[in-house]
Amino acid sequence: MGQKINPLGFRLGTTQSHHSLWFAQPKKYSEGLEEDKKIRDCIKNYVQNNIRISSGMEGIARIEIQKRIDLIQIIIYMGFPKLLIEDKPRRIEELQINVQKELNCVNRKLNIAITRISNPYGHPNILAEFIAGQLKNRVSFRKAMKKAIELTEQANTKGIQVQIAGRIDGKEIARVEWIREGRVPLQTIDAKIDYCSYTVRTIYGVLGIKIWIFVDEE
């Protein structure tokens, strides 16, 4: 069971918390979900188009959304917020205007905050972006996976598993390759495991990257 299910949903309420915090009437629940997706897509597109760092990574670990009747509070957890912070007031103001246009919210105030995370390579989203960048630059998949594991070891994690699926290295038959370092106890609910699945488009086609990181045991 623990091998197949999404590790984040499996641990909600124990070691994982929700990234969206709000209440809605059952009839309006789908509208709230759609709004969240628009907010996250808008922020990611803005970061991608305006403040891309040299390695080609967005560096967003997660986006938390808290909604009240008259306020939408968005917290962006970033691994490399340097470029965003250099010109902080203008950047955030521009981002707020973009999100407000996307949502068309008149009666609600929008507030965006940026939080820097320590050990960015201990977060699977940022690590997946790193691997995707390597694969796009035609670096060998084994080399990319080993480098990713080296980076997580510096972030003091207890274990990592990386899986890449698709037409790896341009081979005609799609296959799945994976590597594990340390412990990754997927069946233990008390184990704090971070997970992400990421799609990367290469010249050979689409590849899927999945990363499990064992952070700690509670």
Curated annotation (Swiss-Prot):
CDD domains, per database record: KH-II_30S_S3 (cd02412)
Domain KH type-2: residue ranges: 47-118
Location of the protein in the cell: Plastid, Chloroplast
UniProt superkingdom: Eukaryota
Gene3D superfamilies per record: 3.30.300.20, Ribosomal protein S3, C-terminal domain
One GO BP annotation of this record: translation
UniProt keyword annotations, A-Z: Chloroplast, Plastid, Ribonucleoprotein, Ribosomal protein, RNA-binding, rRNA-binding
Molecular function GO terms recorded: rRNA binding; structural constituent of ribosome
Database matches in SUPFAM superfamilies: Prokaryotic type KH domain (KH-domain type II), Ribosomal protein S3 C-terminal domain
Any GO CC annotation of this UniProt entry: chloroplast
A Pfam cross-reference name: Ribosomal_S3_C
Oligomer status and interactors: Part of the 30S ribosomal subunit.
Family: Belongs to the universal ribosomal protein uS3 family.
Name this polypeptide is given: Small ribosomal subunit protein uS3c
Gene from which the chain derives: rps3
